[in-house]
Amino acid sequence: MSLDAPSIRKARREDASLLAAAERAIASVPGELASRPNEIDDDAVRKMILDLNDRGRGNYLVAEHAGAVVGHAFLESLSLAATSHVVRLMIAVHEGNQRRGVGRALMNELLRWARSNPSVEKVELQVRSSNERAIALYRSLGFVEEGRKTRRLKIGPNEYLDDVYMALWVGP
């Protein structure tokens, strides 16, 4: 079910506490994020927004609908000269807003930015093997699986999830 298209804007430093709280809520579900809720810090999110948007190391966006932030995502430039053509993508659709077009809207805007940035040639992401909806979204946008790390996340006694590595070439 799709809601009216969310509006997409640049993340601001004052968004950090809200974005960190949303990530903690997502992380409370085993396997959704690699981080545990107590490992997600408001100051780290604030620093990421500063590094990406204010210092030009990438692009950090939020999606809003009816005045509420419903998702966030970013592209982060890799730091080594040999990988400077690659950006890492992270996306989080906030609790209760899945299957409403939020993820696709954020992805479309990030990919538009990546394609218009001459220094970006490749977009990489990782996703849990259990997140079939996200994998389907990424494939529909042209991402291909490049590899898999088996049993990378331990979510319970003798219970593991694979990480799937996907990428999209946007360069020449």
Question: Model-derived features: where do they sit?
Answer:
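Catalytic cores of nucleotide-enabled group-transfer and carboxylate-activating enzymes in metabolic
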Residues: 26-29, 115
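Conserved active-site alpha-helix within GNAT-family acetyltransferase domains
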Residues: 100, 104, 116, 129-147
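Acetyl-CoA-dependent GNAT
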Residues: 13, 32-96, 107-108, 113, ...
